[in-house]
């Protein structure tokens, strides 16, 4: 499971998410087809595991 914000952002973009807005350290990504939204705190090397689980759920990913 990815815990680094850069790696999570790369995977979001690879899976069809685009950056919609940034407010402070919160980057909002929206999927172009499904309109799912995921918010990633960036830059942060080690995101808490509970937050990572929430990002995975918002993105529609299965846990690794």
Name the predicted role of every residue range.
Residues 1-22, 26-64:
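Basic nucleic-acid-binding interfaces
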